[in-house]
Swiss-Prot record:
Its main location: cytoplasm. Disulfide bonds: none annotated. It is an enzyme of class 3 (hydrolase). This is Putative pre-16S rRNA nuclease. It is found in: Cytoplasm.
């Protein structure tokens, strides 16, 4: 069975989350340096069956795109060119970073660990994936 992959795209780092094969549980996978993201996806797609990729869509409260959308659009063009057969969807990612930090607090992580932006990105990708699964 194939998995679903979610990306919390950032200009420096991208958080990656994946479902189990039954598509019931979302788990953080890793955080990738964004310039290495396409190579990471190539390798991952060779080793794992992936049914679709979800990419976070950052929006402002008035539903207009955030400033980072310009960079995401550049990535999406490259993604579609490199992986034309892979279905891709956008998922509203408003507040995922705040939710990620709150989940770290609720989980009892020390302040030093909560400052780990790579971990925040990975948890944010997991929240994006969970949001999609529960819709």
């Amino acid at each position: 069975m194939a998995r679903i992959l979610a990306l919390d795209y950032g200009t420096k780092r991208t958080g990656v989350a994946v479902t189990d094969e039954l598509k019931m549980i979302a788990s953080g996978l890793t955080t990738v340096q964004t310039p290495e993201l396409i190579k990471f996806l190539e390798d991952y797609f060779k080793n794992e069956k992936v049914e679709r990729v979800l990419v976070g869509e950052p929006k402002r409260m008035d539903d207009t795109p955030s400033q980072s959308e310009v960079h995401i659009q550049e990535f999406l063009k490259e993604f579609v060119k490199k992986f034309p057969e892979m279905p891709m969807e956008r998922v509203d990612e408003r507040f995922t970073s705040k939710m990620a930090v709150q989940s770290m607090i609720d989980g009892g992580l020390k302040k030093k660990k909560r400052r780990d932006k790579a971990l925040v990105d990975e948890i944010s990708a997991t929240i994006i994936l969970q949001t999609w699964l529960y819709e």
